[in-house]
């Protein structure tokens, strides 16, 4: 399907993601960064000119959270779920920063997450580490940084970031 047709199908509910390393600044969201389908198409063309690839995805509505899992090639040790500070300025009015930090409550929980949400995210990270080992013949060593979103339809994986890998 062509870009404009797919955007028309999604309406105002889309995200354009650079498929590559962008320092946390490759995602543009309809309504926040992109104010029309033309804006989205211009961004797509900019990415193509850079020699890059991109994804156009349906925008998910909910609360984002991250789950880091330390991997030694065999085992995973999960950190508490956290929420990222993605944007500069008060009230998240500025551009994406590429990561200013994360937070959780003093009890290491997030008020919008249930234990079942965290267990599901942990299971997804575990299954991903297992699949990487099966595909490449050796276990991943580093930090698997899963970006998730808790929606009305449940928890969904948005992306992975890899650290020290």
Regions found by a protein language model. Give the residues of each.
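Conserved small/polar residues in nucleotide/adenosyl-binding loops
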Residues: 1-5
């Amino acid at each position: 399907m062509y870009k404009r047709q797919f955007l028309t199908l999604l309406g105002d509910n889309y995200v354009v993601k650079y498929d590559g390393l962008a320092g946390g600044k490759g995602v543009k969201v309809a309504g926040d960064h992109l104010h029309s389908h033309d804006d989205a198409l211009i961004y797509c063309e900019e990415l193509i000119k850079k020699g890059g690839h991109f994804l156009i995805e349906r925008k998910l509505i909910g609360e984002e959270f991250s789950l880091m899992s330390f991997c030694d090639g065999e085992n995973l040790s999960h950190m508490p779920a956290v929420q990222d500070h993605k944007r500069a300025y008060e009230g998240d009015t500025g551009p994406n920063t590429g990561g200013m930090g994360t937070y959780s409550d003093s009890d290491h929980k997030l008020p919008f997450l249930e234990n079942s949400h965290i267990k599901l995210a942990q299971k997804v990270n575990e299954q991903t580490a297992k699949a990487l080992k099966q595909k490449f013949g050796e276990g991943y060593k580093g930090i698997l940084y899963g970006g998730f979103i808790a929606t009305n339809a449940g928890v969904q994986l948005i992306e992975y970031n890899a650290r020290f890998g």
